[in-house]
Design a protein with these regions (language model features):
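Glycan-recognition patch characteristic of GH18 chitinases/ENGases
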Residues: 25-122
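Short, acidic/polar
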Residues: 36-50, 110-127, 184-195, 355-368
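Conserved, mostly hydrophobic/aromatic
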Residues: 56, 135, 204, 256, ...
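Substrate-binding surface in catalytic domains of secreted glycosidases
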Residues: 68-78, 140-290
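Acidic, Ser/Thr/Pro/Gly-enriched interdomain connector segments
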Residues: 99, 401-456, 461, 499-501
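Glycan-binding loop/region signatures in secreted carbohydrate-active enzymes
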Residues: 253, 260-365, 395-396
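Acidic/aromatic/glycine-rich contiguous surface patches that form carbohydrate-binding/processing clefts
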Residues: 359-404
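Extracellular LysM carbohydrate-binding repeats and other cell-envelope/extracellular binding modules
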Residues: 394, 455-464, 468-501
Length: 501
């Protein structure tokens, strides 16, 4: 911790309390941003579920073009003051976010020593009113790398014992961004210096969402099997991002960003199951429910562990689509693709892709498997899947739900059906038990899914473990559509191992 360097050594020897720091290192944290633009519902949602959080991040402060900070709450008035009081009463940290996303203003303020110091002081004064401060400066030019690091250093030295949290971009491995090897000049030039962030940030929130097409390796893999692929955050991508980040930033500081919103796309289908995606807007899950009802369609869980549905609106508009008379026996994507292929033409349809409670819970389990400190939810405002809270609570307090018991042998017949992400059942628990019998394919090191704590749910961590199993035994690789899917070949090998347990 940064304040230790400010305490004389003899005082430190007298007053150092080891259990506090040991506890902090072993706690899995669940934090969440509470946005100002829905202040009443956001704060009410956070207050109602405050005991399920270890930290709230009121998303209320914004840096202005002149480098001053504006309080958009205001934080000292209801409902924000009520949120703060409730959090403090329940021993939940309050770390307000200071946001900024104006490249020219960031360049002007941060590159000038006097204005940079003034911003450090203003941010530190906010931190001292709470448990710390969260810095969310986005879209900075790469040439601000040195100056932003100087800002973090100055802030870190000014806040005393308070925490400095940094929100940083999700870096996709360059080879996955450009699998064809044609890497544009300047790729890999970032304004955030991860080494300095590791030094001057006590917590680091990785913004692992808004993936879209950044991971071309995964997009190409989906396209090769004619799958729709426009995820908010594919667990495979999240895993790659976190593993890359952990090369520079301590896992004990990292929280994985978890989205609660989705995207609607206007998709054009071309001959041969080829698709072009144009983002229309973001939405909360309630909107998807409305579309389900209007068009009599049902969502399915996709390979990215998110829900998706397709439909063809009667009239293309820039507002919410109206009801359609399309034959609902046809899935819109399949109908559009069939039309485009038969006529060697193209056809448009809509795609909704969004995370639900299962997606959020699986991200938490993945974060545990990756060995990071916790998850950071964006956003808490009453618009998320209402089942999210019980899903998170279940992960935290019901580690033995669906368990096969601690370390005993498996009393079960062989695996009889194909298994994939999103499925559940006692055979999933058997699958996890087999995978956990080998340390190189274990589902999780601790918590739900770990040895002795197997569950009945096939989530992102189970899928990653299946991939490791398939790679180990040469059954499938990342370029194979069956990667992470328990089909006949994988099941045969699993059953052979099961017979020996």
């Amino acid at each position: 911790m940064k304040f230790l360097s400010k305490i004389p050594l003899f005082i430190f020897a007298l007053f150092f309390v080891a259990p506090i720091f040991a506890s902090a290192a072993t706690t899995f944290e669940v934090s969440g941003w509470v946005p100002y633009w829905n202040g009443a519902t956001s704060t009410a949602d956070a207050i109602a579920h405050i005991t399920e959080l270890t930290e709230v991040d009121p998303f209320v402060y914004a840096v202005q073009n002149d480098g001053t900070i504006k309080d958009l709450g205001p934080m000292d008035q209801a409902p924000w003051s009520t949120l703060v009081a409730t959090a403090q009463a329940n021993h939940v940290r309050v770390i307000p976010t200071i946001m900024w996303s104006n490249p020219s203003a960031e360049e002007s303020v941060l590159s000038t020593a006097s204005s940079r110091r003034a911003l450090e002081i203003a941010a530190a004064n906010i931190a001292k009113q709470y448990d710390g401060v969260d810095i969310d400066f986005e879209n900075k030019p790469a040439d601000l790398r040195k100056y932003f690091s100087l800002f973090l250093q100055g802030l870190y030295e000014r806040v005393g014992t308070k925490l400095v949290t940094c929100d940083i971009e999700a870096r996709t491995p360059i080879g996955d961004m450009y699998p064809d090897g044609n890497i544009p000049a300047g790729t890999g030039d970032y304004a955030n210096d991860y080494t300095q962030i590791n030094k001057y940030c006590d917590r680091v929130h990785i913004m692992t969402y808004d993936q879209q097409t950044v991971d071309q390796a995964l997009a190409n893999q989906a396209a090769s099997s004619s799958q729709l692929y426009a995820p908010v955050a594919d667990p495979q991508w999240v895993s790659r991002v976190v593993q890359l980040t952990e090369q520079s930033i301590s896992p004990k500081k990292i929280s994985v960003g978890v989205p609660t919103y989705g995207y609607e796309y206007d998709v054009t289908a071309y001959s041969g199951n080829q698709y072009n995606y144009d983002i229309m807007w973001t939405f909360n899950p309630k909107y998807a429910t409305q579309i389900e009802q209007q068009y009599n369609v049902q969502p399915t869980r996709n390979a990215a562990d998110e829900l998706e549905l397709t439909y063809i609106p009667t009239t293309a508009t820039t507002s919410m689509p109206v009801s359609s008379n399309i034959n609902n026996a046809l899935i819109a994507a399949a109908a559009a693709s069939q039309y485009a292929t038969q006529l060697n033409s193209h056809m448009d349809f809509r795609l909704l892709d969004w995370p639900d409670a299962t997606s959020v819970a699986d991200k938490a389990q993945l974060a545990k498997q990756l060995g990071v400190r916790g998850i950071a939810i964006f956003k808490i405002d009453g618009g998320e899947d209402p089942n999210m809270w019980s899903a998170i609570q279940g992960l935290a307090s019901s580690a033995t739900t669906g368990s096969l018991g601690g370390g005993g042998s498996i009393s079960s017949s062989s695996l009889q059906r194909d298994l994939s992400i999103g499925m559940s059942g006692s055979d999933v628990a058997v699958l996890q038990k087999i995978l956990n019998s080998d340390s190189s394919t274990q589902v999780a090191a601790s918590g739900p899914g770990s040895k002795g704590n197997e569950t009945t749910k096939f989530g992102a961590a189970t899928k990653l473990a299946v991939e490791k199993f398939q790679s180990k035994y040469g059954i499938a690789s990342a370029s194979n559509p069956a990667y992470g899917f328990v089909g006949p070949a994988t099941r045969a090998k699993l059953n052979a191992i099961l017979a020996t347990l």
